Every structure is written in structure tokens, then in C-alpha cells.
From Swiss-Prot:
Residues 94-118, 144-180 have a biased composition (Pro residues). Homodimer. Forms a complex with the accessory proteins ExbB and ExbD. Residues 1-51 are cytoplasmic. The chain crosses the membrane at residues 52-69. This is Protein tonB2. It comes from Pseudomonas aeruginosa (strain ATCC 15692 / DSM 22644 / CIP 104116 / JCM 14847 / LMG 12228 / 1C / PRS 101 / PAO1). Belongs to the TonB family. Keywords: Cell inner membrane, Cell membrane, Membrane, Protein transport, Transmembrane, Transmembrane helix, Transport. GO terms for biological process: protein transport; siderophore transport; transmembrane transport.
């Protein structure tokens, strides 16, 4: 059985229908193809008036959008509360007095002994002294009668000698050096003063110099503002804190005594 070959409409203008009739298809198809090839579909061209209207409409639309965006309120930024930096309170302890050592005792002067004289055996010896002639004996005088001895008066008694003055008392021993009291926040665990809220908000800073009377037990009994910081709030905060402090009392030797100490307190905001 032969395989049917495809038929081109351009080469085969006739087609056999199932009923056996022949239909001429070549001419109508060729005319349609000719029209499509020589008359392609053309798009509709806008007129000048329509173009101007479209441009005006686009500009109006863009202007409305820009106006609407400009009327929108910018959202307010969130308020950030001011942050207070950490507070640094410095404590400066007064320098301890320098105890000068006693000067050394002067050494006794060394007395140099004169060297012994050197005897020169070869030196010329002096001539021996001449013998002294013996004196001639004088005639003995004749004894004369002696007068009677007078009575010897007794000597007056000697005045009593004054008693020797008593020996001066031995000088008292030198007193032991006095060590002033001190406040060391490092090992005494003294709490730092609280920074007043008003001074913190207004940025007040200053140094308060306190004069503290320390008992032998180490507790403060009296606090005086020796030099103010210029802010009453800072002065009161310093006095309030030092009332709770513990001090190293003054000592004379190994014995604790009452004493005064100066305590500077610095209030600084970093």
C-alpha cells in the first residue's frame, strides 16, 4: 500500500472531497495570501489632540501624587531619654607627715698621740757635768736662850660646808611619734557618697574638704565643712556619707587617741 504524499495548495489547486467531488482551493487561498502579504494590519495612530490630552493627564496625575506625598506628616522620631554617664567619685587621703629621723650623735674626736722621740745613738753625747766643789763648813753659831713659848689659842671651828645640791632628775623619755587618723576607702569599705539628683541634672561638680574629729574607736564625732564646693547639695551629700564611715584612729606609739583628719571628696560627672 502506497503512503499518501502531502499536497501543496500552490502546486495542487484541486482537492478530492470524501464524496468524490473535486473542489478548487488554489485560487481563493492564493488571493488570501496575496492580500495578507501586500496589506498588513496597521495600528491606529493617535491624533495630535489626543496626544496633548494624554500628556496633560499624566502631568496632572503626577502633580496630584506629589502634592499628596508632601501633605503626609513625617512620623515623629522616638524621644530618647538622656543617659547619665557613670559617676566617678575620687577619694584623696592626705599625705602622712614625714617623720625625720633624729640626727646621729657626733663621734668623740680622735686624739692622736704624739710619736715617741727617736733616740739617735750616733748623736754626740753632751760632755759630763763638772763636779761641783763642796762648800766649806761654816762655824756653828752659839745657842741663844729661847724665849718662853706663848700659849697657842685654839683655832676657830671651820664653817660647815654647804650640802651638795641634789642631782637633777633624769630627762623624761621622748614621747612616741603621733600618727594622725586616716580614712582609707579601700580596706575600710567606706560607702561612696550618693550624687544628688539635682546636681546630676544640672551638671554640678566640685570638691568638698571636710574636717573630721575621729575618736579612739575610729568613729567620727564631729564633721566640719572646711572648704565648700560652692553647691550646698554636694556639701550635704558629702557630710551625710562621711557620718557612716569608719576611720583608722590616731596613734601615739601603739595607743589609739582622738584626732582630726581632713577628708577631700570630689564630685565629677564623666
Amino acid at each position: 500500500m502506497a503512503t499518501p504524499q502531502p499536497v501543496d495548495a500552490r502546486t495542487q489547486p484541486w482537492r478530492e472531497t470524501p464524496g468524490g467531488d473535486l473542489v478548487a482551493l488554489g485560487r481563493p487561498v492564493r488571493q488570501a495570501l496575496h492580500l495578507v502579504r501586500h496589506n498588513p494590519a496597521q495600528g491606529r495612530v493617535l491624533s495630535r489632540r489626543e496626544t496633548i490630552l494624554l500628556v496633560l493627564f499624566a502631568l496632572t496625575l503626577h502633580g496630584a501624587v506629589i502634592h499628596w506625598l508632601s501633605q503626609q506628616r513625617t512620623p515623629a522620631l522616638p524621644e530618647v531619654p538622656p543617659q547619665v554617664p557613670p559617676m566617678t567619685i575620687e577619694f584623696t587621703a592626705p599625705a602622712p607627715p614625714v617623720v625625720e629621723p633624729p640626727p646621729p650623735e657626733p663621734l668623740p674626736p680622735v686624739v692622736e698621740e704624739p710619736p715617741p722621740p727617736v733616740v739617735d745613738e750616733n748623736a754626740v753625747k753632751p760632755p759630763p757635768p763638772k763636779p761641783v766643789p763642796k762648800p766649806k763648813p761654816k762655824p756653828k753659831p752659839q745657842p741663844r736662850p729661847k724665849p718662853a713659848p706663848k700659849a697657842v689659842e685654839p683655832a676657830p671651828p671651820a664653817p660647815p660646808q654647804p650640802a651638795a645640791p641634789p642631782a637633777p632628775p633624769a630627762p623624761a623619755a621622748a614621747p612616741a611619734p603621733l600618727t594622725p587618723p586616716s580614712a582609707n576607702a579601700g580596706y575600710l569599705h567606706n560607702p561612696a557618697p550618693e550624687y544628688p539628683a539635682l546636681a546630676m541634672r544640672r551638671g554640678w561638680e566640685g570638691t568638698v574638704l571636710l574636717r573630721v574629729h575621729v575618736l579612739a574607736s575610729g568613729s567620727p564625732s564631729e564633721i566640719q565643712v572646711q572648704k565648700s564646693s560652692g553647691r550646698e547639695a554636694l556639701d550635704q551629700a558629702a557630710v551625710k556619707a562621711v557620718k557612716r564611715w569608719s576611720f583608722v584612729p590616731a596613734k601615739r606609739g601603739d595607743k589609739a587617741e582622738d584626732g582630726w583628719v581632713s577628708v577631700p571628696i570630689d564630685f565629677k560627672l564623666n
